């Protein structure tokens, strides 16, 4: 029997026994800490379908999707709700360890409007700005739209709503009735990652196809009352919450690897590039502040250009090399060529780069099991520092450049063999840490009021679509806020076989002189890709 004191009436033993409530795992708790300590706002996936859908279609597919993947229908239940925010910032909570994490549960009653940000009063003001900006930009996603959405907070610990919302962007041609083909999946990262966002739209498109091709059984009453989940009615149809991925994959590093980890962490702190402006200091989000604000910039590469990039990688490295190390090399070479960032001092010889990865690849080879982890914050990643001097590659020095690409690829592969891909998150899961430290306090002290350095480069991969189907995902853009994670730069990559590859680039304001200098760098980065990919 679980101890549910402090979580009642939202958590019951019956829910736990049915598999519709459980405690969070260590990795899930990490992202919950970022949110409840106001150190992260959101990440987003922007999607364009090939044609519009109406409200009835959207309600139907959301109902089916949330029943099949209960992770999408869950919320985090904090202690002392509705006074949880004060509790989690109190000395009473922060002064001692809590080895047992909070619960998650399937939401008892969920309506269409609980999922759609357009219809929620607390977001009315920002939604008006978002809709107007999208129309002003000719119904296209731009950096201006991304910068409007980036600071939006999805509150943690609401028993009636999940950790994500869907924005339905206005349509250009409605033919007299409202349809949508442009959407934004917005989440606080709890129970979700970039791959989850891509999967969400892939699954929506498949279900829209199913409705059009085969029809769909539904109750007219459902359409009228707009209820997506009525737990008492639907619980037998709702899948069980999967175990935390940390119960399936051991993130914890061997104790023998800790001396090296702590030594490299010390070097990162004292010998790597750091920002120097007061405006780049990491901070908590608040309604009245401009904390962690960034400039964004979008780059697009057509399917033909992506094929050319892949061909050059294959020619100059080998068949197995992926896009990410090429993008990383171009990014770092362009930073060096900008000649506006690095001081070249003796105490600034490294630049750190984090590459998140999809931890689902380490799950057992069981199709049904893997499918149950389609949604969730199931990430790992490598985090290395590289010599700034190695980015100095003159124009035309192809051999040196492609050697750098191969080196980055090899380091990423090695991180799987030596455990580096999980150690950063795994250290926080060690028993002697969890049992003796308050994780909220530990992370807040480590992340807040710090200068930034380095880049986080995320590539959610290629989404392949069948364009002969009635519905398919035409385009995807992945973006995430800087938060208090101490990175100065962000580079988020997402691709479809229909419209090619999009990159959302971001820099925390104050890292470079102004937006103009940032845009100059982004253009230089684009030119660097063109130079080495022969575009």
Curated annotation (Swiss-Prot):
Location of this chain's protein in the cell: Lipid droplet; Endoplasmic reticulum membrane
One MF annotation (Gene Ontology) recorded for this entry: alcohol O-acetyltransferase activity
EC number: 2.3.1.84
InterPro entries: Alcohol_O-acetyltransferase (IPR052058), Atf2/Sli1-like (IPR010828)
Catalytic activity line of the entry: an aliphatic alcohol + acetyl-CoA = an acetyl ester + CoA
Misc remark: Present with 3000 molecules/cell in log phase SD medium.
Family per similarity comment: Belongs to the ATF1 alcohol acetyltransferase family.
Free-text function comment from the UniProt entry: Can use acetyl-CoA to synthesize acetate esters from various alcohols, producing ethyl acetate, isoamyl acetate, isobutyl acetate, butyl acetate, hexyl acetate, heptyl acetate and octyl acetate. ATF2 seems to play only a minor role in the acetate ester synthesis, compared to ATF1. Plays an active role in the detoxification hydroxysteroids and possibly certain phytochemicals, in association with the efflux pumps PDR5 and SNQ2.
UniProt-recorded name of the protein: Alcohol O-acetyltransferase 2
């Amino acid at each position: 029997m679980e101890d549910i004191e402090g979580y009642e009436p939202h958590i019951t033993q019956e829910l736990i026994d049915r598999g519709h409530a459980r405690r969070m795992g260590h990795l899930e708790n990490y992202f919950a800490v970022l949110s409840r300590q106001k150190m992260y706002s959101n990440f987003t996936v922007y999607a364009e379908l090939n044609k519009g859908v109406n409200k009835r279609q959207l309600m139907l597919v959301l109902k089916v999707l949330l029943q099949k993947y209960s992770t999408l229908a869950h919320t985090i239940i904090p202690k002392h709700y509705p006074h949880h925010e004060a509790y989690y910032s109190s000395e009473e909570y922060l002064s001692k360890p809590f080895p047992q994490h909070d619960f998650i549960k399937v939401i008892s009653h969920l309506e269409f409007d609980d999922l759609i940000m357009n219809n929620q009063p607390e977001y009315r003001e920002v939604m008006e700005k978002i809709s107007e900006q999208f129309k002003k930009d000719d119904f296209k996603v731009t950096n201006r739209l991304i910068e409007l959405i980036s600071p939006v907070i999805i509150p943690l610990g609401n028993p009636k709503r999940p950790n994500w919302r869907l924005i339905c962007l206005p349509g250009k041609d409605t033919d007299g009735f409202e349809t949508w083909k442009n959407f934004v999946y917005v989440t606080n990262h709890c129970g979700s990652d970039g791959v989850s966002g891509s999967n969400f739209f892939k699954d929506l498109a498949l279900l829209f196809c199913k409705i059009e091709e085969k029809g769909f059984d539904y109750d007219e009453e459902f359409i009228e009352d707009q209820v997506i989940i009525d737990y008492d009615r639907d619980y037998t149809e709702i899948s069980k919450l999967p175990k935390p991925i940390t119960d399936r994959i051991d993130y914890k590093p061997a104790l023998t690897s800790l001396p090296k980890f702590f030594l490299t962490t010390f070097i990162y702190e004292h010998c790597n590039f750091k920002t120097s402006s007061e405006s780049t200091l990491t901070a908590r989000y608040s309604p009245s502040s401009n904390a962690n604000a960034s400039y964004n910039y979008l780059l697009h590469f057509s399917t033909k250009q992506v094929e050319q990039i892949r061909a050059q990688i294959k020619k100059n490295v080998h068949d197995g090399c992926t896009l990410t190390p090429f993008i990383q090399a171009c990014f770092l070479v362009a930073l060096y060529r900008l000649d506006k960032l690095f001081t070249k001092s003796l105490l600034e010889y490294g630049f750190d780069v984090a590459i998140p990865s999809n931890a689902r690849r380490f799950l057992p080879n069981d199709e049904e099991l893997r499918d149950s982890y389609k949604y969730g914050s199931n990430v790992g990643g490598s985090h290395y520092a590289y010599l700034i001097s190695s980015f100095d590659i003159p124009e035309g020095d192809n051999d040196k450049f492609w050697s750098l690409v191969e080196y980055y690829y090899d380091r990423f592969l090695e991180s799987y063999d030596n455990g580096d891909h999980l150690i950063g998150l795994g250290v926080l899961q060690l028993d002697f840490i969890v049992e003796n430290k308050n994780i909220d306090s530990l992370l807040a002290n480590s992340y807040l009021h710090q200068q930034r350095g380095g880049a986080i480069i995320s590539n959610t991969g290629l989404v392949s679509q069948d364009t002969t189907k009635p519905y398919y995902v035409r385009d995807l853009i992945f973006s995430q806020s800087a938060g208090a994670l101490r990175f100065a730069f962000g580079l988020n990559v997402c691709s479809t076989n229909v419209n090619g590859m999009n990159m959302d680039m971001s820099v925390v304001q104050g890292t470079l002189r102004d937006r103009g200098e940032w845009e100059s760098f982004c253009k230089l980065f684009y030119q660097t890709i063109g130079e080495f990919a022969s575009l």
